Amino acid sequence: MAASRVCRLVDEAPEPLWDRLADFSNWRMWLDRVRDSRMAPGPTHSPGATRVVGDPDNPRVHEVLFAVDARTYTLSYGVAPEPVWSVPARNYVATVHLVPLTDRPATVVDWSSRYDCDQGDEQKIGELFVALYHEFIVNLTSPQPA
């Protein structure tokens, strides 16, 4: 199993970041890469929620919310095996954890994933996910429109 991870310190308290992150149905509101996102029938903010996401590289990715914990500021989601994802990774599960600093209004954003891939693809896929997580964290922490 391969893994990718990005941790970044941001000068923002965890609460507003968590409000954006925990709203699984509205990541398109802050994530520049996502041009289209709609929720599948069923729950929208609890485990089992499924969104169908479109982005320039993956026009129809089905992402499933596995866990959400407001107390620990932790959220886990994954990509459903069907339809086929254009990224050659399988059993993809990502976790985003916000770690509040105690001495000032700042947060460590820890975005990580574990996945299976073919031998020899680990570096290429790892670099892709690291670049995406950097982009996601920048989008998450950028000023939001009113």
Residue ranges and their predicted role:
Residues 10, 56, 102-104:
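A generic beta-sheet turn/junction motif
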Residues 2-7, 50, 60, 74, ...:
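Intrinsic-disorder/low-complexity, polar/charged segments enriched in Ser/Thr/Lys/Arg/Asp/Glu/Gln
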Residues 82-138:
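Beta-strand/loop substructures that line and gate deep hydrophobic ligand-binding cavities in soluble
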Residues 29, 38-87, 143-146:
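Glycine-rich portal/gate segments that line the openings of hydrophobic small-molecule binding cavities
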Residues 1-43:
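Hydrophobic ligand-binding cavity/cleft-lining segments
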Residues 6-8, 61-67, 91-101:
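Hydrophobic/aromatic beta-strand elements that line small-molecule binding cavities or substrate pockets
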